[in-house]
Structure formats: structure tokens, C-alpha cells
Curated annotation (Swiss-Prot):
Family: Belongs to the peptidase C40 family.
GO molecular function list: cysteine-type peptidase activity; N-acetylmuramoyl-L-alanine amidase activity
Protein's organism: Mycobacterium tuberculosis (strain ATCC 25618 / H37Rv)
Designated name of the protein: Probable endopeptidase Rv2190c
Protein EC: 3.4.-.-
Length: 385
């Protein structure tokens, strides 16, 4: 065998050996990674992912319900407008018919009485007094005819306008009914979708170990509800937040406060928002419930709505609606009681309580908690009500 052939064979064998050991090394690394991966972490991550999807659907469902309520109100208003316009049309037609009868009578009298032109009276009058009488009668008849014709014309115009208004309101009522039907169908679809997602989330929750469930169910420390700093914005911005538009937890407690807990001022500057925060903090430990808005269980926007209700402020049960109501607030100017919304679709909400903390109802299996405000995901915006 020639030298170059032996060299070529040896090179092929060497390449094969290197490829084998390289493949073995990579496979061993992947296997080791799989062996070292914590199944518990995978289960929790999957639960969080599924719960997040269910929360998005829940808040979209709330928004769809608000949209349906608005469309139904528009439909009721359109139906009422249609009824009013039809009543006005009937009245206009009745008035027109009345004047039509009067005009017909005047026309008949004129026809039966002959010509009413002044020159005819002059030419046919047999005496000055008869001329005066005829001219007087002609003036009265002409005035009556002119008045009746003017009223007849006005009634006709009114009837035409009433008919046009009735036609428009009928079209508006049909459009409102169609829009309401479309929104109702969308709402029903989201309701069905949510029920499936809830079943999947609960199934994933069952897969957790008892220890994991216990850890999730721990509400953590309950802040005192004695007082809240009326203005305690975070001292720094979280990573990735634009300057002046995204806070992070403060590092030092306000004067008079416990370390790690917001300070609450009993009365005065906080106003209604103090009552909002106090109400929300009384629910720390309450369970998460899809669509919940009462102490038996809350979803994120349900907790916000309920807490504000306790202060006499009515808010919608929808994080997306909360993200667009009230007054916008820069994150550097946050005050306790401001509403925070999260993610690009504003599908999560919580209540800022000061010192970089917020109270919220986050997800299934996790009770209402106080957490750092930047721990729930990217902040969408902040609103003050």
C-alpha cells in the first residue's frame, strides 16, 4: 500500500474518532443537564405560563363584558330614539292630515264661490256697498287660505323630517343590535376559552408537590394598615425602564415605618387613596379567583375594583380599562393608591402602597400579596383615580 493511501486512511479514522468523542461529549452534557434540571422548577414554570395565559384571557373577558354593556346601552338608546321618532312621525302625519282637510275646504269654497280677484269684484259690483262687501270677503278668504296653506306646508315639512329621523334611528338601532350581537359572540368565545384554560391550570397545579403548594399559598408578611406615606415614590428605576418612567423599590423605609413595610399616615394627606390601600391590605392572604371581586376571592382587577369601592370610588372590573382611566402618572411621581398595570396588553393590575411596593392578586394558587412593584412583569402605565 502506498504511503499516501495509508496516510489518507489514518486521517479518516482520526476524524471519525474525533467526531465520535465530540458527539459523546455533547450528548453527555445534554443528558447531564436533563438529569440536573429540577422537575419542580419545570412544573412551577409551566404553572406560571398557563396562569399568565388564563389571566390574559380573564382580563380580555372583562373588557369584552364592558364593551358589551356599552353596546347594549347604545342599542337601548337607539331603540328609544326610534320609538320617540316614530311617535313624532305619527303626530306630524296627523297634523298634516288636519291641515289637508282645512286646505281642501278652502279650495272647495273658493271653487264654489267663483273667482276672488279684486278686479272681478269691481267689474261685477252693482253698487259701491256691494263692492266694499265683496272686497272684504275676498280679503278674509285670501288671508284664511294663505294661513292654511302656510300651516299645511310647515306640517308637510315636519312630517318629512320626522320620517327621515325615524328611518335613521331605525338604521342606528339595527347597527347597534348587530354590534351587540358581535360583541356577545366574542364574549361567549372568551368565556369558553377561559374555562378550558382554567381546567389546564388546575391540572398543572395538582402536579405540584405539597411543599410547592404550601410555598405558593404563603402570603408573606402582612404590612400594617395603620398608615401610608402620602408620597413615597421609589428611589431608583428598575433595569430597562426609561428615565423618569419606571420605578424600583426604595432601599430605605420612610420615617416612622417598619423596615420593608410602607409607613401609613393615619389621616390627612392620603385622602380616599389611604382608605383604598388600607382596604386592599386587609385582603392579604385572600385566595385568587378568576373573575373574583369580593373577599372570598379576587382576580387582579377585581381586587383593585373592590378596594376602591370601599373608598366610595367606582372603577371598572378590567385591567385594560383601568390602564386608560383616571389621570396618567409618571412612575417617578407615584403615590400610595395609584393603580399600576403590567404587560403590553395591560392584562395585570395592582395597587401601589409606597416604598416601591404594591399589593395585588397575582395568579391561581397564590393569595393576595405585597410584592416589589417591578416583580410582576413590565409596567404598562400608572393611573391615579
Amino acid at each position: 500500500m502506498r504511503l499516501d493511501q495509508r496516510w489518507l486512511i489514518a486521517r479518516v479514522i482520526m476524524r471519525s474518532a474525533i467526531g465520535f468523542f465530540a458527539s459523546f461529549t455533547v450528548s453527555s452534557g445534554v443528558l447531564a443537564a436533563n438529569v440536573l434540571a429540577d422537575p419542580a422548577d419545570d412544573a412551577l414554570a409551566k404553572l406560571n405560563e398557563l396562569s399568565r395565559q388564563a389571566e390574559q384571557t380573564t382580563e380580555a373577558l372583562h373588557s369584552a363584558q364592558l364593551d358589551l354593556n356599552e353596546k347594549l346601552a347604545a342599542q337601548r338608546a337607539a331603540d328609544q330614539k326610534l320609538a320617540d321618532n316614530r311617535t313624532a312621525l305619527d303626530a306630524a302625519r296627523a297634523r298634516l292630515a288636519t291641515f289637508q282637510t282645512a286646505v281642501n275646504k278652502v279650495a272647495a269654497a273658493t271653487y264654489m264661490g267663483g273667482r276672488t280677484h279684486g278686479m272681478d269684484a269691481i267689474l261685477t259690483a252693482e253698487s259701491p256697498q256691494l263692492l266694499i262687501d265683496r272686497l272684504s270677503v275676498q280679503r278674509v278668504m285670501a288671508h284664511q287660505m294663505s294661513t292654511q296653506m302656510a300651516r299645511f306646508k310647515a306640517a308637510g315639512e315636519q312630517a318629512v323630517k320626522a320620517e327621515q329621523a325615524a328611518a335613521k334611528s331605525a338604521a342606528d338601532a339595527r347597527s347597534a343590535a348587530e354590534q351587540a350581537a358581535a360583541v356577545r359572540a366574542n364574549l361567549q368565545h372568551k368565556q369558553s376559552q377561559l374555562q378550558v384554560q382554567i381546567a389546564v391550570v388546575k391540572s398543572q397545579y395538582v402536579a405540584l408537590t405539597p411543599e410547592e403548594r404550601t410555598a405558593l399559598a404563603d402570603p408573606g408578611p402582612v404590612p400594617a394598615v395603620a398608615a401610608i406615606a402620602p408620597g413615597a415614590p421609589p428611589a431608583a428605576l428598575p433595569p430597562g425602564a426609561p428615565p423618569g418612567d419606571g420605578p424600583a423599590p426604595g432601599v430605605a423605609p420612610p420615617p416612622g415605618g417598619m423596615p420593608g413595610l410602607p409607613f401609613v399616615q393615619p389621616d390627612g394627606a392620603g385622602g380616599d387613596r389611604t382608605a383604598v390601600v388600607q382596604a386592599a391590605l386587609t385582603q392579604v392572604g385572600a385566595p385568587y379567583a378568576w373573575g373574583g371581586a369580593a373577599p372570598g376571592g379576587f382576580d387582579c382587577s377585581g381586587l383593585v375594583m373592590w378596594a376602591f369601592q370601599q373608598a366610595g370610588i367606582a372603577l371598572p372590573h378590567s385591567s385594560q380599562a383601568l390602564a386608560h382611566g383616571g389621570q396618567p402618572v409618571a412612575l417617578s411621581d407615584l403615590q400610595p393608591g395609584d393603580v399600576l398595570t403590567f404587560y403590553s396588553d395591560a392584562s395585570h393590575a395592582g395597587i401601589y402602597i409606597g416604598d416601591g411596593l404594591m399589593v395585588h392578586s397575582s395568579t391561581y394558587g397564590v393569595p393576595v400579596r405585597v410584592v416589589p412593584m417591578d416583580s410582576s412583569g413590565p409596567i404598562y402605565d400608572a393611573r391615579r383615580y
